Protein backbone atom coordinates (compact mmCIF):
# COMPACT_ATOMS: atom_id res chain seq x y z
CA UNK A 1 0.00 0.00 0.00
CA UNK A 2 1.16 3.55 -0.69
CA UNK A 3 0.36 6.32 1.82
CA UNK A 4 1.06 10.03 2.00
CA UNK A 5 3.54 10.73 4.81
CA UNK A 6 4.15 14.02 6.65
CA UNK A 7 6.08 16.29 6.87
CA UNK A 8 6.90 16.02 3.13
CA UNK A 9 3.37 14.94 2.09
CA UNK A 10 4.90 12.50 -0.38
CA UNK A 11 3.49 9.11 -1.32
CA UNK A 12 5.65 6.24 0.00
CA UNK A 13 5.39 2.47 0.16
CA UNK A 14 4.31 1.04 3.52
CA UNK A 15 4.77 -2.54 4.73
CA UNK A 16 2.20 -5.17 3.76
CA UNK A 17 -0.86 -5.22 6.00
CA UNK A 18 -0.53 -1.59 7.08
CA UNK A 19 -3.24 1.08 6.77
CA UNK A 20 -2.97 4.76 5.85
CA UNK A 21 -4.20 7.34 8.36
CA UNK A 22 -4.99 11.04 8.62
CA UNK A 23 -4.84 12.46 12.15
CA UNK A 24 -6.04 16.02 12.88
CA UNK A 25 -6.17 18.01 16.12
CA UNK A 26 -6.13 21.56 17.44
CA UNK A 27 -3.28 23.15 19.35
CA UNK A 28 -2.71 26.68 20.64
CA UNK A 29 -2.48 28.06 17.09
CA UNK A 30 -5.60 26.34 15.73
CA UNK A 31 -7.57 29.58 15.32
CA UNK A 32 -4.76 31.13 13.27
CA UNK A 33 -3.25 28.20 11.35
CA UNK A 34 -6.05 25.62 11.41
CA UNK A 35 -5.84 22.06 12.63
CA UNK A 36 -2.54 20.21 12.88
CA UNK A 37 -2.32 17.29 10.44
CA UNK A 38 -0.30 14.08 10.60
CA UNK A 39 -0.34 11.66 7.65
CA UNK A 40 1.21 8.22 7.76
CA UNK A 41 0.86 4.46 7.85
CA UNK A 42 0.55 2.07 10.76
CA UNK A 43 0.04 -1.64 11.41
CA UNK A 44 -3.41 -0.84 12.85
CA UNK A 45 -5.55 2.28 12.93
CA UNK A 46 -4.24 4.49 15.80
CA UNK A 47 -6.37 4.79 18.93
CA UNK A 48 -8.61 7.86 19.00
CA UNK A 49 -8.05 10.24 21.92
CA UNK A 50 -10.18 13.16 23.07
CA UNK A 51 -9.78 16.13 20.71
CA UNK A 52 -8.08 14.04 18.00
CA UNK A 53 -9.79 12.90 14.78
CA UNK A 54 -8.33 9.86 13.02
CA UNK A 55 -9.43 8.49 9.65
CA UNK A 56 -7.95 5.22 8.35
CA UNK A 57 -8.14 3.67 4.88
CA UNK A 58 -6.57 0.77 3.01
CA UNK A 59 -6.17 1.75 -0.65
CA UNK A 60 -3.21 3.45 -2.33
CA UNK A 61 -2.90 7.18 -1.59
CA UNK A 62 -6.28 7.32 0.17
CA UNK A 63 -5.01 9.79 2.82
CA UNK A 64 -4.46 13.11 0.98
CA UNK A 65 -3.84 16.29 2.94
CA UNK A 66 -7.28 17.55 4.05
CA UNK A 67 -8.64 20.79 2.64
CA UNK A 68 -9.01 23.58 5.16
CA UNK A 69 -12.39 25.00 6.03
CA UNK A 70 -12.62 28.72 5.27
CA UNK A 71 -14.32 30.96 7.88
Curated annotation (Swiss-Prot):
Subcellular location: Secreted
UniProt GO cellular component terms: extracellular region
Cystine pairings recorded for this chain: 3-20, 14-41, 26-30, 45-56, 57-62
Predominant cellular place of this UniProt entry's protein: secreted
Gene3D superfamilies referenced in this protein's UniProt entry, alphabetically: CD59
Keyword Secreted: yes
InterPro entries noted in UniProt: Snake_3FTx, Snake_toxin-like_sf, Snake_toxin_con_site, Toxin_cobra-type
Tissue specificity of this protein: Expressed by the venom gland.
SUPFAM superfamilies from the UniProt entry: Snake toxin-like
Task performed by this protein: Binds with high affinity to muscular (alpha-1/CHRNA1) and neuronal (alpha-7/CHRNA7) nicotinic acetylcholine receptor (nAChR) and inhibits acetylcholine from binding to the receptor, thereby impairing neuromuscular and neuronal transmission.
Family: Belongs to the three-finger toxin family. Long-chain subfamily. Type II alpha-neurotoxin sub-subfamily.
Designated name of the protein: Long neurotoxin 4
Organism in which the protein naturally occurs: Naja naja (Indian cobra)
Amino acid sequence: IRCFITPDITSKDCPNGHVCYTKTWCDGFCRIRGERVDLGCAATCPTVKTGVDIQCCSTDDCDPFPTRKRP
